[in-house]
Structures are given as C-alpha cells and as structure tokens.
C-alpha cells in the first residue's frame, strides 16, 4: 500500500537511537478505502483480523519509507499496540489483532516476534474498525 499521510499534528515515524516508532496505522483496504465499523456489530472476528492485517501492511509501508526501502535495517519488532473499535460485549480483541501480529511475523520471521496489547475502544479516528502502532529496533 501507499504510505498514508498523518491525519493530525504528528509524524508517521520517529527514529530515536536504535528505535523506530510507527504512529497508529488505520484499517484501509487495498483500494485505499477506509475499513469502517465496529467489531461485534458490523464485523466478524475474521473480518476484523483482515482489517488488522491491513494495518500491519501499512506499518510495513511506513517502515520501508522511513528506511528508504531497506527492511534489512530492522533488527526486531519490539511491540504492537492494537485498538479495536468494538461493542461493549465484544471480547475477542486479541483474535482481531492476531491479524497484525501474524503479518509482522510472516514478514520478519523470528525477528517479528513481539510484545503486544489488544485494547477495546468504542470509537477510532475516521470511524475505522482497527488501528495498530509499532515499535521496532534497528540494527
């Protein structure tokens, strides 16, 4: 996907020492459309998983852009934080955010294994279903 510009007063990436912080990447489909809605109401766990996967692909795009296309500069993924727009009774946030986690591990192998939080929220920017941010360690 194309690296999306921030929608507020912040930067998409920030390198501090050997760490690269990636701002929250929202769920956008392959055609550039926002994946909007609420888990437990408009989306199944499987659809949420796919939305989280798209967030991870956007994280990779931002990382590649920051590193001038050279993902070999990534030593490891430290942490992902996933936010799931969900109903009060929806409790499968971890299953949804597995979409992002599985994608990062698929791309980086063992170096992609990370710590994680999967958080429920009743609203996300622009009405999207999922948002994920990341922290990477660089070589």
Sequence positions of predicted segments:
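Short, polar/acidic, helix-capping and beta-turn segments at strand->helix junctions
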Residues: 1-139
């Amino acid at each position: 996907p194309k690296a999306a510009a921030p929608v507020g007063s912040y930067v998409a990436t920030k390198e501090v020492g050997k760490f690269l912080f990636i701002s929250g990447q929202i769920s956008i489909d392959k055609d550039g459309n926002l994946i909007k809605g609420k888990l437990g109401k408009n989306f199944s766990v499987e659809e949420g998983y796919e939305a989280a996967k798209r967030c991870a692909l956007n994280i990779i795009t931002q990382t590649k852009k920051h590193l001038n296309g050279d993902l070999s500069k990534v030593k490891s993924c430290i942490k992902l934080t996933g936010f799931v727009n969900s109903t009060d009774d929806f409790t499968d946030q971890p299953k949804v955010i597995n979409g992002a986690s599985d994608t990062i591990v698929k791309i980086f192998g063992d170096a992609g294994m990370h710590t994680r939080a999967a958080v429920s929220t009743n609203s996300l920017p622009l009405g999207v279903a999922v948002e994920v941010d990341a922290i990477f360690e660089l070589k």
